[in-house]
């Protein structure tokens, strides 16, 4: 209504500033109301779908969509359900890592036991770092950043691969491998993509290719 009055120039000049403030307030109230309604819709959807067994029956891409919905709401009421999904080995490693990252971002305190690739680790999201904040990831990234400083195209591609692999493997890093050896194997991995084949550490390359396969979300 106020906007219509402005458009039709029915508000006196001396009153326009006051009415503009009212108009802005009304817009904020409407926006907040829409946001609350949106959050309620998401919460209703999540309560319906986020049973572990039902979740496992969904295609991975649909699971990913549901996980993205979680980023828009307070996930503390769902922390026990999320814990169960993260600890379920049948849930895709990438999905489990994303759920864990959401708990970290919202600083949710709960003890979780994660097993991947024959390794197991207990952690509390409220006290944990995100995948790309882990020390060995940073070391490998810095080595490769220096090496590909003059080749931004390859470096951009490598950054994307590195971050995807770090998320899928999370909360595990490259132990027992040394960061320099991992970085060198990533260089060889990139060279193979361009048709250049060299000798490499088979165990590290196997891990890289496994992570690459898992990143396809099939």
Language-model features: where?
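Structural recognition of alpha-solenoid helical scaffolds
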Residues: 47, 62-65, 74-81, 95, ...
């Amino acid at each position: 209504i106020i906007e219509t009055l402005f458009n039709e120039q029915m508000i006196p000049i001396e009153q326009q500033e006051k009415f503009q403030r009212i108009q802005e307030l009304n817009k904020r109230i409407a926006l907040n109301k829409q946001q609350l309604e949106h959050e309620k819709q998401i919460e209703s959807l999540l309560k319906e779908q986020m049973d572990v067994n039902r979740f496992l029956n969904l295609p991975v891409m649909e699971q990913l969509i549901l996980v993205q919905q979680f980023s828009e709401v307070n996930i503390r009421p769902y922390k026990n359900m999320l814990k169960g999904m993260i600890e379920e080995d049948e849930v895709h490693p990438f999905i489990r890592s994303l759920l864990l990252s959401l708990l970290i971002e919202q600083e949710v305190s709960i003890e979780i036991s994660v097993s991947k690739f024959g390794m197991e680790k207990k952690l509390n999201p409220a006290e944990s770092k995100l995948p790309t904040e882990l020390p060995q990831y940073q070391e490998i990234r810095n080595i490769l950043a220096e090496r590909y400083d003059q080749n931004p195209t390859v470096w951009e591609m490598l950054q994307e691969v590195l971050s995807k692999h770090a998320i899928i493997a999370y909360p595990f890093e490259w132990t027992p491998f040394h960061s320099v050896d991992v970085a060198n194997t990533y260089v060889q991995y990139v060279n193979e993509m361009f048709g250049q084949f060299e000798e490499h550490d088979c165990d590290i390359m196997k891990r890289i290719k496994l992570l690459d396969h898992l990143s396809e979300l099939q």
